[in-house]
Structure formats: structure tokens, C-alpha cells
Amino acid sequence: MKKIFVLTGEPSGDKLASEVISQIKTKRTDIEFLSVGGANLEKLGIKTIYDQKEITYIAFTDILLNFFKIKRKIKDTVNEILKFNPDILFSVDSPDFTLRVAKLVKEKNPKIKIIHFIAPKVWAWREGRVKKMKEFLDHILLLFKFEKEYFDKEKLTNTFVGHPLLDKKINKNFVRK
């Protein structure tokens, strides 16, 4: 049986992940899921190791006040993912959390494939991140067509799937037509 760990860090990521996972579940019944998610993934019957609300902070002061809690959650999340030993870690948005976790998972178990949905806006700011992302991401799913050229140039394997709010037409292979 294949295993996928779904990693989200905020409600919008939970919503997007649930849309992708619901499509996968209609095509494949031989996949075991585990997550850090919220209500949308739970509605699909996917167990979560903790609710993403435990790591969702908006204000900078909230992040500072909870810095050590967040670091502990990152460590605990990595350990739970490694214990689950998925074939794929599917991380969604929230790059400051999900990509930190993904990097640590890849360092500890390079066999786990890491697919990230919603590219960080490295083409707009903090461009140096893309070089680090190439070290641990196996594939990235893109919202905007112009991102494809950028990530192709950076030699990061990618697929343009489109923006869920702009276009709901995604085929069974998660490629926008």
C-alpha cells in the first residue's frame, strides 16, 4: 500500500489539499493518508496528527511569542512523518513551515519524494530560496503559467496546474488544460 503524508499550515492549504486528495481518492483506494491538516482533510477521513490551528500564527508578535513552540512542532512533525514513512510528502503552501519540515524530512530520509503545491513567490522576493528548494523538492505544482518558465530555467521539476480560484478545470493528472 502506498502512503502519502499531507502537510498544511493554514486553512487555505487544508482546502487546496483536500481538493487534490479528494480527486486522488476517487481514482485510487490503495493509498494510506496521514496529515497535519484541518476540517477539510478530516471530512475526507484523513487522520491528522494535530490540527493545523496549533501552528497557524498571523501576527509577527504571535510568531515571536510562540517561537519555541513552533520549533518543537517542526521537530515533532518531522519525527511523525519519518515514523509514518510515506512514499510521498505532499506539502501545501505555508512555505515558512512546510518547506522547513520538508527539508528536514529529505535530509533524514532521501527516499521520500517531496511534492510541494503552490510555489513560494521566489520570482518576486527572496529569490535565493529556489537554490535551496532544489536540494530537497522533487516536484513543485504551480499556480501561474509564467512560473513554469521561471522554474524550468532554475531546473526545478514542475507542473503548471492553474489557480483553483481562477480555473477549476484540472484533469485527472492535475494538469490544467
PLM segments and residue spans:
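Active-site and donor-binding regions of nucleotide-sugar-utilizing enzymes
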Residues: 3-176
